[in-house]
Amino acid sequence: MVSVNELGLDLFEELVENADLFNVAYHELDNGSRVVDCGVSVPGGYGAGDYFTRICMGGLGDIAFRQGMVGQFPMTFIDVNTDFPAISCLGSQKAGWTVKHDNFFAMGSGPARALSLQPKHTFEVIGYEDESDAAVICLEADRLPSGAVMEMIAEKCKVDVANVCALVAPTSSLVGSIQVAGRCVETAVYKLNELGFDTTKIIAAAGTAPIPPVRGAKLAMGVTNDATIYHGQINLTMNAPEIVDYLEKIPSCSSNGYGKPFNDIFKEAGYDFYKIDKSLFSPAEVIINEVSTGKVYQVGKVDTAVTLKSFGLA
């Protein structure tokens, strides 16, 4: 079985060795744990975003950047693909670990989740659990973790604190925008898992989404989510004829909340995240190739108007 932490650690070491080339900052804490700042006090960039996203996927995904169009506007897109959709997306990339300690708060994702089993049910349904002496975690936060935070992560992962490695980027940073858009495939796999579909039947997955502009901390969560909700396009290859029973529920347009920028929806919900229809967190359009029957299905559509409004271009 592949180890997402061992693969992620190899990429982490590459990033550390070339920190200056990627506009990131490397820190070794007093307890021996290691942190790479990808956007808190440094600019980061596309190179750092590439590493952050691939590490977040446990080294089981590839990404590329390209120029595309959102309506009449040229935008940079991120293309993502993986041959291990369930493990890379649900077992690693999913932001399934809320890391809290004193005044520190972060959404945790990446390989370390496969050691801490956060949340446990996810790993039960995909039948995966990592074994590694090192833990690599990706933190979506606006400050760097302290030694005490890294100690807590080590305890949850059952590893020595000196073997804990963290990458950190705020949502409202270039790397933050890149890595959230880089979750476009994960949202499709996540949605199918939430619907009760066996995601281990997905053979391969690929997708694309525009990288949203950095518009400040207040708008960051909404803008980054909208990139996938309204313009994420995904291709799934699977051996699962039963997918026909799930098709109409997959795309974001199946949600009651669909049709407005996320920040507008959030405001209408009284800024209570839990009042938002969970089914909204899905890609705009999905193409599925079911190989046992040879059938191809298409559901959903991109919404250029809402995307541009969210991005500040309309």
From Swiss-Prot:
Enzyme class, broadest EC rank: hydrolase
CDD domains: MCH (cd00545)
UniProt catalytic activity: 5,10-methenyl-5,6,7,8-tetrahydromethanopterin + H2O = N(5)-formyl-5,6,7,8-tetrahydromethanopterin + H(+)
InterPro entries in UniProt: METHMP_CycHdrlase (IPR003209)
UniProt keyword terms in alphabetical order: Cytoplasm, Hydrolase, Methanogenesis, One-carbon metabolism
Pathway: One-carbon metabolism; methanogenesis from CO(2); 5,10-methenyl-5,6,7,8-tetrahydromethanopterin from CO(2): step 3/3
Biological process annotations from GO: methanogenesis, from carbon dioxide; one-carbon metabolic process
Keyword field contains RNA-binding: no
Name of the protein in its database record: Methenyltetrahydromethanopterin cyclohydrolase
Organism: Methanocorpusculum labreanum (strain ATCC 43576 / DSM 4855 / Z)
Gene name of the encoded protein: mch
